[in-house]
Amino acid sequence: MTVIVPIHGPAPALAPAPERVGVLLVNLGTPDSCDTKGVRVYLREFLSDPRVIENQGIFWKLALNGIILNTRPARKAKDYQKIWNQEKNESPLKTITRAQAEKLAASLSDRSHLVVDWAMRYGNPSMRDRIEALVAQGCSRLLVVPLYPQYSAATSATVCDQAFRVLRELRAQPTLRVTPPYYRDDAYIDALANSIHAHLATLPFKPEMIVASFHGMPQAYIEKGDPYQSQCVATVDALRERMGLDDKKLLLTFQSRFGFDQWLQPYTDKTIEKLAKDGVRKLAVVMPGFAADCLETLEEIAQENAEIFMHNGGEEFSAIPCLNDSADGIAVIRQLVMRELEGWL
């Protein structure tokens, strides 16, 4: 009898499980509470960052600890109280950033090795806590996503600073990538245009013009080489082209100046005041540089600047919501993330 013994080749190698990749969305920050104490803690951290206030000399430190932190927190606490999410006992920025991370994670649910999280540069959840949490979950690669369409040393760069500050204390560091600014990305410009059209369609009036208001910064920072202003201009130029508007129908301004130095101009509040005095009666304001609504959009623009407009003769005013966690807003972030994850997936 002949016995045939089957010959088996080597067992096929199992494909290695994909490495876990952390995706960390980062926005500016928020106090933990809307009382004076909570705002003081937040402002101390924020205003002590040399990327934000570049001259951190003895005179600034005396002013910060002697005057600013003893007067400004009470005023800003009142502003936060006007917009505070009472149900969750947190700022809208925290609520929205969490929602952005959750919806981004849901849109990437078919990629089980991706772990999406979120953090604040100042305040909580801190970048340190969330980076350490991602590493503890086995993420050997980390994509940090600064939620700023336009780059500035005072925003995007300080996110990088903090990420490296955390990583340099780790023995086993994850590989790190950081998403670039997306100030002219088609998806971003399309999302802005869509959000403006959608919001205007809900209004009982037609604005005579639209103001595009960006967070300001000291003019001196631009003179030192910060590209922020040029990127804001590029965003508005692209938005004008997409919407078929000229520079008289879509204006570019800068808000939120602080201190006595000259900041980027034209100033939003002064422009809105002049428009009203010049006879503009119906106005809308969009804030393209903010990925999520926050104190600067919900209180400074939607309340303070609306009051300025009305007080000087304006009749109808509307602040257009930021992209937030809208479908278009999440699509912008998702495209940015997927592009930067190439080679890791």
UniProtKB/Swiss-Prot annotation:
Gene3D superfamilies: 3.40.50.1400. This is Ferrochelatase. Fe cation binds at H215, E296. Pathway: Porphyrin-containing compound metabolism; protoheme biosynthesis; protoheme from protoporphyrin-IX: step 1/1. It holds the Pfam family Ferrochelatase. It comes from Rhodopseudomonas palustris (strain HaA2). The keyword Cytoplasm applies. One of its GO terms (cellular component) is cytoplasm. It catalyses: heme b + 2 H(+) = protoporphyrin IX + Fe(2+). InterPro entries: Ferrochelatase, Ferrochelatase_AS, Ferrochelatase_C, Ferrochelatase_N. It is found in: Cytoplasm. NCBIfam families: hemH (TIGR00109). One of its GO terms (molecular function) is metal ion binding. GO terms for biological process: heme biosynthetic process.
